[in-house]
């Protein structure tokens, strides 16, 4: 790392350990959480009852506890990153759908660390079921299908004969494309763009901003945290469940910077949080 920092100061080393409290101390600039190991990352998106499912039966508490522990151990040596997915995981859209994906991205793009968006997750690209394994992909093969740009041959990915593609496209009805989502202001694609723009203009939401959890999302409860920098403090409240929630939050947060799925109302010193919503307040 000293050599890289000296010779290529704008480069960064990213590990694939999934244990940032170890990898950052070993010299990497950043590490991203994985679907195995001690992080409880799967509790959020990829388990029988993920926290971001609108059924509201999941819990983020174990993830939050381990995340705080990892940040404490890592100190300021590097970034702990939370990816939307990668080539070894089930697609995010295999377990989450519609508004659930929008709320999940609100979390991913307001947390510390460098955002990692696996290609296609920003349009809800689906896991392609029942594919023959390609070069040792096995059940991971369905997460490696081509990007889908439009409705031309092979969804705009290639003009080759479909049978010559390395992995087939998702040919089922309502298969998402970039073209369709760019034409729809209510699409997941546009929501992700809004969140990226929000992150870029608020120092508290940048990769190295601090975080303090107000609610750990235990047993389907809202997940709430305060992001802060030297210039500002921002409150993020996330309620993936399909029912209204009530939360006590310290401080005065009157300015809405972002909302999806419904707003947060102040009432008798508490916050009334809309179902399937994410809100960013200042």
Report residues per predicted region.
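Beta-strand-rich binding/interaction modules
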Residues: 244-262
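A conserved amphipathic helix/loop scaffold
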Residues: 237-238, 264
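The catalytic "switch" region of P-loop NTPases
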Residues: 34-42
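Glycoside hydrolase catalytic-domain groove-lining segments
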Residues: 53-77
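Loop/helix patches that line or flank the sugar-binding groove of alpha-linked glycan CAZymes
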Residues: 4-12, 18-19, 23-27, 31-35, ...
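C-terminal beta-strand-rich structural cap/linker in extracellular carbohydrate-active enzymes
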Residues: 265-282
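Generic detection of short hydrophobic beta-strand segments and adjacent strand-loop junctions
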Residues: 147, 245-249, 271-273
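Extracellular glycoside hydrolase catalytic/binding regions
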Residues: 43-48
């Amino acid at each position: 790392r000293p050599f890289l920092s000296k010779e290529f100061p704008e480069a960064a080393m990213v590990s694939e350990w999934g244990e940032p409290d170890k990898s950052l101390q070993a010299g990497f600039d950043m590490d991203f959480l994985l679907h195995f190991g001690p992080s409880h990352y799967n509790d959020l998106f990829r388990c029988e009852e993920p926290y971001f499912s609108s059924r509201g039966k999941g819990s983020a508490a174990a993830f939050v506890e381990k995340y705080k522990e990892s940040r404490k151990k890592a100190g300021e040596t590097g970034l702990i990153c939370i990816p939307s997915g990668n080539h070894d995981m089930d697609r995010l859209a295999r377990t989450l759908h519609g508004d659930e994906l929008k709320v999940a991205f609100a979390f991913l793009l307001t947390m510390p660390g460098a955002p990692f968006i696996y290609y296609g997750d920003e349009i809800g690209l689906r896991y392609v079921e029942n594919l023959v394994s390609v070069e040792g992909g096995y059940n991971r093969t369905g997460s490696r299908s081509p990007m889908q740009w439009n409705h031309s041959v092979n969804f705009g990915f290639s003009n080759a004969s479909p049978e010559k593609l390395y992995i087939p496209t998702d040919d089922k009805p309502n298969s998402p494309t970039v073209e369709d989502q760019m034409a729809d202001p209510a699409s997941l694609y546009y929501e992700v763009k809004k969140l990226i723009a929000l992150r870029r203009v608020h120092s508290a939401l940048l990769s190295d901003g601090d975080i303090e959890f107000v609610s750990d999302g235990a047993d389907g409860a809202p997940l709430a945290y305060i992001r802060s920098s030297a210039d500002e403090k921002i409150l993020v409240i996330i309620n993936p469940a399909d029912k209204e929630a009530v939360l006590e939050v310290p401080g005065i947060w009157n300015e809405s910077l972002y909302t999806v799925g419904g707003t947060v109302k102040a009432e008798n010193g508490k916050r009334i949080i809309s179902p399937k919503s994410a809100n960013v307040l200042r």
